[in-house]
């Protein structure tokens, strides 16, 4: 029994001594660095220097660690310490000096407009030190100054593949992908959806975390009627940035277009949870509740919307629709009136305002509202129809017949207009 205990003690003690060997810790750190596990390598190198502060290879290890992070100054400091302890490492120090010289040469060549020569200098660094992200960064910067933003994006992204924490490369890539996004947005506004898509796709090709480009791809696909693809892109944007309320909202609109109203409600509520002041989400949510005839819920969310923003014209408009559906035309007219005050160019608001006024027999105001609708959108039968109703209500049969001719031109309003004109011409037919 004593022999067994002694053997176990020897093994444990031997293992402890083995783990305390700075050479072993240094080798473990090198293995970690090659795998990109730089924080673990840092801990192992620190441990080796605790055991033996004069262990020069650990300082070389730190020098390489800093080089992998793109910090040539700190890499040189650690290399200098190693050389002071052991001249054997002078060649490594010289290699760092060569990097510094080539970077200076590259910068000078860029200033002189010799971009190809600068790229050769940086490529020479990459060939010798492929894990040094700063070289890829300078290649990206050279391409950026040469106005080749796609090549710049490639090199910035390569630097980040080597070391994701490289802040200058991250900033450079952000600048480039934002340019691609802006170019895409300009193409989108011009109506060139194919070109816009190309720019957005390039942005996410170089930066798979660029949620705004995924969002814009979703908007584009939605506009083209590709609902499934749009939803996929919106979900990608949300996966990257879960608190992006606009993506939740626009995802909701995609589900609403597909008549998947339950899913749309969930997405709108999520948008509201993330941004309680986002009135558009309340407006769309109220619209769905109106469609499914849950009027109390519709009123609640729409009243909340106009409390948040009393000038939210669409909120007043939709609240007016809720009241109209319940045949509360006076209340509806008050909301439609506010909608026209806050959005004077909305023909639909003027049309609905005229309709509600006709329903409560305020024919003079209804005629004026209908005329506003007609002035804004002449080729809309609804405005002409409400004008017919208003003029007839005022007792102006001649004008009503005149406006009937206009209303009768529009297929969607023809049946109603013809019934109304028959009522004008044959009043006894409609007497109760």
Describe each region flagged by the PLM.
Residues 27, 61, 95-96, 104, ...:
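Canonical tetratricopeptide repeat
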Residues 22-23, 56-57, 90, 99, ...:
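Helix-start (N-cap) detector for alpha-helical repeat units in TPR-like alpha-solenoids
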Residues 51, 85, 128, 162, ...:
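Structural marker of alpha-solenoid helical repeat scaffolds
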Residues 35-44, 69-81, 109-121, 146-158, ...:
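Structural signature of tandem alpha-helical TPR/SEL1-like repeats
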Residues 105-108, 170, 175, 179-191, ...:
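Terminal, low-structured helical/coil segments at or just beyond the last alpha-helical repeat
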Residues 98, 107, 321, 325, ...:
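Alpha-helical adaptor scaffolds
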Residues 17-46, 50-52, 56-57, 68, ...:
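N-terminal leader/linker segments that initiate helical-solenoid repeat arrays
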């Amino acid at each position: 029994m004593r022999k067994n205990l002694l053997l176990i003690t020897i093994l444990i003690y031997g293992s402890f001594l083995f783990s305390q060997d700075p050479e072993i810790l240094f080798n473990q750190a090198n293995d970690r660095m090659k795998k990109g596990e730089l924080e673990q390598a840092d801990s192992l190198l620190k441990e080796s220097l605790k055991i033996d502060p004069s262990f020069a290879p650990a300082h070389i290890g730190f020098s390489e660690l800093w080089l992998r992070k793109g910090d040539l100054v700190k890499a040189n400091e650690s290399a200098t310490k190693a050389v002071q302890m052991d001249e054997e490492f002078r060649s490594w120090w010289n290699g760092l000096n060569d990097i510094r010289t080539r970077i200076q040469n590259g910068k000078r060549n860029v200033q002189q407009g010799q971009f190809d020569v600068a790229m050769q200098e940086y490529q020479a660094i990459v060939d010798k030190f492929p894990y040094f992200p700063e070289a890829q960064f300078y290649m990206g910067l050279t391409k950026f100054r040469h106005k080749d933003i796609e090549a710049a994006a490639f090199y910035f992204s390569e630097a980040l593949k080597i070391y994701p924490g490289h802040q200058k490369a991250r900033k450079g890539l952000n600048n480039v992908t934002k340019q691609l996004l802006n170019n895409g947005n300009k193409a989108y506004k011009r109506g060139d959806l194919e070109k816009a898509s190309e720019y957005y796709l390039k942005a996410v090709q170089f930066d798979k975390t660029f949620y705004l480009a995924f969002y814009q791809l979703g908007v584009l696909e939605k506009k083209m009627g590709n609902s499934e693809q749009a939803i996929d892109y919106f979900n990608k944007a949300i996966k990257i940035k879960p608190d992006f309320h606009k993506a939740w909202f626009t995802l909701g609109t995609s589900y609403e277009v597909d008549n998947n109203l339950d899913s749309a409600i969930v997405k709108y509520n999520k948008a509201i949870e993330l941004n309680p002041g986002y009135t558009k989400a309340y407006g769309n949510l109220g619209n769905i509740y109106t469609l499914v005839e849950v009027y109390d819920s519709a009123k609640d969310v729409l009243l909340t919307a106009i409390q948040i923003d009393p000038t939210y014209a669409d909120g007043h408009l939709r609240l007016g629709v809720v009241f109209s559906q319940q045949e509360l035309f006076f209340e509806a007219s008050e909301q439609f009136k506010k909608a026209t005050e806050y959005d004077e160019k909305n023909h639909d608001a003027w049309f609905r305002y005229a309709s509600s006024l006709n329903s409560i027999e305020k024919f003079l105001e209804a005629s004026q509202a209908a005329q506003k609708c007609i002035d804004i959108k002449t080729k809309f039968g609804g405005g002409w129809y409400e004008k017919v109703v208003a003029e007839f209500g005022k007792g102006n049969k001649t004008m009503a017949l005149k406006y009937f001719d206009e209303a009768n031109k529009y297929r969607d309003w023809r049946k109603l207009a013809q019934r109304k004109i028959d009522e004008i011409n044959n009043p006894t037919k409609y007497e109760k």
